[in-house]
Amino acid sequence: MQTNQNSTPMSDQLAQITERQCQTAPAAYSDLKALFLNCTLNRTPVLSHTRGVIDIAKAIFEANGVETKVIRPVDYDIAAGLGVDMAQTPEWDKDDWPQIQKEIDATDILVLCTSVWLGEKSSVCNRVLERMYGYTHLLNAKGQYRDYGKVGATLITGNEDGVKHCAMNILFSLSHIGYTIPPQADAGWLGEVGPGPSYLDPGSGGPENDFTNRNTTFLIWNCMHLARMLKDNGGIPAHGNQPDAWDAGCKTDFKNPEHKR
């Protein structure tokens, strides 16, 4: 499900920079897919200020031919738990998470996006990471954890401190799940502390903020560069990182225990 709010226009300066960078790109990216999970607390069609930053990033992806999609997890009934499908357990009658996981599985680049509340990522973002973690026992075709070879990043907005704290937690979580994190994989915008204007409010200065636009641009290009390298090289090499091989006694650089010989 995608939001129906209007896209945030790029500033003229950012549009010119993006056009120039696209013309001199070192590779083609049109076979890549990027998914934004907008972990706003607002259900569609309520305005999401986080979507404003997403639109800037989305435009840079699309200028390079990357296929993009935006989903608001809050629009779905996502059960709590660590199962693959909690509707198959006695605890829950319904679980929409498998629909979202299917979209995640089909993408090369995942950008988790959240607003800051009480210095933390949103409760929706936390549940998304919990559900993703519930799939980490599954393996890919090479016998690695299933999300090896995918790229992860984060975009954050708010009116209080916490962007770097949220990014630290989100990027670690994605890495732990199996994602590869590029350099400078976080970008964010903070308005005036307190009840000041939010990103999309008139006069906020958000869409024109040079620091946010620079970091968002670096984030998107680094995601594309890394995804390109991973895709062209078949992902992460399958050596020394396969759980079943380890359990079978093939412990790279360690002697097999006596009972495995």
Task: Locate predicted features.
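N-terminal beta1-alpha1-beta2 submodule of the flavodoxin-like/Rossmannoid cofactor-binding fold
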Residues: 1-142, 206, 210-261
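Short, surface-exposed amphipathic charged segments that create phosphate/polyanion-binding patches used
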Residues: 196-204
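Short, glycine-/small-residue-rich phosphate/pyrophosphate-handling segment
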Residues: 48, 141-194, 211-214
